[in-house]
Amino acid sequence: MPSGATGDFVLAAPVLATEVEEPGGGTAGAPDPWSSVPVGDSRVCVGCGAQRIDTDGYCEACGLAQPRPRDHQERSLNGVCGVSDRGHRHHRNEDAFAVAATSRPDGSSAVVAVVCDGVSSATRPDDASQAAADSASEALLEALESGVEPETAMTEAIMTAANRVDELADEYEREPSRNAPACTIVSAVVTEGRVTVGWVGDSRAYWFPDDRSGSRRLTVDDSWATRMVEAGLMSEAEAFADPRAHAITGWLGADAIEVEPHTLTFTPDAPGTVLICTDGLWNYAEAAADLAAVVPADARTKPLHAAQTLARYACDRGGHDNVTVALLPVDRVEPHEPTMPNHPPTLVGDSLDSPTIQLREGES
């Protein structure tokens, strides 16, 4: 896919749009940073103090882009939590996430997290990721509450998200040299100690037991490099050194020829934490062992702090991309035989000549 022009990278002051747990399991959302003041000149520039903020969010006096609600977000509900940050190089946050909790018909609890990464070289990637995260989360909750098995619910939720992103192509005028709105997706459900993961694209899921001894990646990227390695056409070093390495071969969007959700279900053999994230995090610690060294030891009991730490880790190492991470603690270990994946599943049957789409602007 042709790459677009790079955006204007403006650093904005930190903004925190957050939801935190209250006693009884509810959440209280912090107000939109602009919602408590009238629209117009009463808004004050965080850089120069002028009260001249235009409708696009820029200061007419110094030109500084003002913080937006999506620049930094944190949410936590019944243990499952997520943190998203714009990073230091992009002018907006094109990642999105959702976290939720519900009950199954038998009374058992279930927690859900969805993370999506908008394709920067497509039209309105921020809207694509938000639409996918919201629609997938809603579909998962509805299915789980109706008694649908998590793996089936996951597949259906990803397809629901795909359809919603498809619809955006008709809602926006496509920008020149850009594809229709598009994004990746990764999602996880934890219920009664059992984990189900689903994904399309290169957003990832990892499993970290409390002792970190069996840490592993649960997903396989839908990417050009992955396909070359799995086909035996290139070594891993050769494939990932190629300029086409990070071109994704699976995504949600009207330009995707076919959406094929991948799913994985397993029962952990020990308490631990499921982590799902965009490449804004894993680009700085790709291997499970490397990422395990960064995940705080108390991630299962303090997941929000752990998510904050991981987002900060990515930003401290350059923040070249938006970064989003969600954590789902797994406290309960079933007494029956655990089922643990030995390695990430392979994409058996996927065509090696599938179309690709560039994730970020400037890639070729």
Outline where the language-model segments fall.
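PP2C/PPM-type serine/threonine phosphatase catalytic domain
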Residues: 1-364
